[in-house]
From Swiss-Prot:
GO biological process terms held by the UniProt record: L-histidine catabolic process to glutamate and formamide; L-histidine catabolic process to glutamate and formate
Gene: hutH
SUPFAM superfamilies, A to Z: L-aspartase-like (SSF48557)
EC number: 4.3.1.3
Protein location: Cytoplasm
Name recorded for this polypeptide: Histidine ammonia-lyase
Modification(s) after translation: Contains an active site 4-methylidene-imidazol-5-one (MIO), which is formed autocatalytically by cyclization and dehydration of residues Ala-Ser-Gly.
Subcellular location, principal: cytoplasm
Amino acid sequence: MITLTPGHLTLPQLRQIARESVQLKLDPASFAKIDAGAKAVADIAAKGEPAYGINTGFGRLASTHIPHDQLELLQKNLVLSHAVGVGEPMARSSVRLLMALKLSSLGRGHSGIRREVMDALITLFNADVLPLIPVKGSVGASGDLAPLAHMSAVLLGVGEVFIRGERASALDGLRVAGLAPLTLQAKEGLALLNGTQASTALALDNMFAIEDLYRTALVAGALSVDAAAGSVKPFDARIHELRGHQGQIDAAASYRELLEGSPINQSHRDCDKVQDPYSLRCQPQVMGACLDQMRHAADVLLVEANAVSDNPLIFPDTGEVLSGGNFHAEPVAFAADNLALAASEIGALAERRIALLIDATLSGLPPFLVKDGGVNSGFMIAHVTAAALASENKTLAHPASVDSLPTSANQEDHVSMATFAARKLADIADNTKHILAIELLAAAQGVDLRAPYHTSPKLAPVMETIRSQVAHYELDHYFAPDIAVIAKLVGERAFAKVAPFSFASEQ
């Protein structure tokens, strides 16, 4: 059970919500603020004074006054008309994050929503009745309207859900959770719809996956150093301290620890080789830059996870209703775009190491890592697959945040495209996962070919894990299942756990 304290969510809590079947409860300390916000809205609605989002239309229709007896219909119509998403359902982990983030934002007491509505969301979450939310349809301003409308429609008994993973109607979902359809009061539909929770949830969910891939890449890169008989001297702490970038310093320390005591490395300490190619030698510089970007993105996304991104905002202490633009997800878009760059570079560097290993001139290993080359092609086309995936990532890494299209009759004339920026991270991460799987296989093959010498004590379990699933490549065979089984292990963090490094979300 995780206690949600609005405005004080942590990265470990968010990772746990996404990855584990934890339940939620709202911190009782937030109740007074929530109730005060709801009362402030009720008072404004009762007076009939024009206030955006409470008794007016929305967007370009903001100047249209809505009579008191139509306020409930206004909120219902808002939710139903905005539920226009398309595409595949959002991943379960992302929906769980979305709901938790929405509860945190509402729980700060500036949205004017009743606890009854929030309790219904928590009940659905804890019953594992999750809204079916199409993943496409948001431009990231005014908030993530379409995705959040699909979440909200379930509270009205409209739309679809997943009940413990099985697709069903919203009414069936409410029944399983012991709930009845709600009637939303003034502003409550808008409070549910307005916000950056979809883009932030997608960005966080994919960031956690990319963090795991980063750690796996450290392990794969270190194993490739041994496979290629590379030097550990470029990882000397003194080099990296002189430059001063913390990510680079930390990455170099990881490589030193992973390669400590490697018999392969000790076997060629006195060779006449002067310098390794950049894909080996400059790993701390490249991976360190990725790490710095990822840490910055995590900082930004944690702030956004705790933010109130509704509009308008209710200030119960003064009774004011202030319209602003906290729904504009530009910070999320930038963070997601930076994560895309980092994840793509992780894969790009791994692809270059695969290319190095299969090149006999550079690695000193048999061509394409197989004996009797010619009749056997070995890792030749596995590298082509890695190259295809790395190239695809370069296109996917194009920043989404530089794009904008005006919407709502030019009232909303600049948007963030944060949801797409966050969503495409999943494709980049999946490509990078498979590149790393191919590298792990290639590096393990190279280490085998260095016999009688072995890799380091830290990397020995990695070799054991790989060889427990995939045998040494002796002769050409149907290769795709080998890649698939190692990619599955990458996704399960089997190799990430070996890295002597952790992110803030894992602490």
